[in-house]
């Protein structure tokens, strides 16, 4: 509420507009923005580079990638996994050697204590004139003194073990964060599921005008059509890829034509349900397109 007096208003109420303005300027609080059409990728763009694909490939979850970009991503992830695994093995060896040193030091301490105990044994002469009562009293006194000694030693050891930040020798030390064993599988950057190079499906888009080259095709808004019905493809048209041929068809064509015979119209191969892969589209910018159009950024919160 620091900017309330600087705003062009004489009202005593902290308005919603001022609150949003202060939230954006202060750097505190969760900030949310409603995304528009320009913030949504097209259906034929790579999910990594957000650029139209030259050599598109599709995952089994329906995410479209540029082949070069996704191969570079897989290679980078494998190198990162190798680095993490190397660091984990190094930590494992360090913990193992530390455990061996601790066990050796404990054995050495036990041996030293045993030697001291053996050297401190002194046989006292038995006095024949002492009565059993005095022996019992002596035993009781000895047990009491030993118990008090044990209690005092236990208290002193527990008090010495307490961490004290004002004493340099008793200052608690922060233990290093232990690394977890990294997973060796490369995951998809969009879905998070395991990703393999052999699972990528080559996609063949049917251009709207075959006479145009790629540069001229990219300047148009309507670039590709369905391989069967020749309907224009876009973010507002649900479409799918047929695994055997890799062609892109509309979901309307799949429901009305292809699912009747379950045959690929291009190659003539038999199709299964898993061979029809819907493409994950970016949406149209409208709320009813099925895409979350609200971006949120969680920032520190000022609490009273």
UniProtKB/Swiss-Prot annotation:
Keyword DNA damage belongs to the record: no
Subcellular location: Cytoplasm; Nucleus
Motif Nuclear localization signal: positions: 78-101
Role description: E3 ubiquitin-protein ligase that is essential for proper development of the forebrain, the eye, and the face. Negatively regulates nitric oxide production by inducing nitric oxide synthase translocation to actin cytoskeleton and inhibiting its enzymatic activity.
EC numbers for this chain: 2.3.2.27
Comp. bias intervals (Low complexity): 143-160
Alphabetically ordered keywords of this record: Cytoplasm, Developmental protein, Nucleus, Transferase, Ubl conjugation pathway
One GO cellular component term noted in the UniProt record for this chain: cytoplasm
Record Pfam families: zf-NOSIP
Similarity section: Belongs to the NOSIP family.
Gene3D superfamilies: Zinc/RING finger domain, C3HC4 (zinc finger) (3.30.40.10)
Species name: Danio rerio (Zebrafish)
Keyword Transferase in annotation: yes
Main location: cytoplasm
GO terms assigned for molecular function: ubiquitin protein ligase activity
Name of this chain's protein: Nitric oxide synthase-interacting protein
Domain of life: Eukaryota
Region (Disordered): 94-165
Biased composition regions of type Basic and acidic residues, renumbered to the chain: 99-118
Catalytic activity: S-ubiquitinyl-[E2 ubiquitin-conjugating enzyme]-L-cysteine + [acceptor protein]-L-lysine = [E2 ubiquitin-conjugating enzyme]-L-cysteine + N(6)-ubiquitinyl-[acceptor protein]-L-lysine
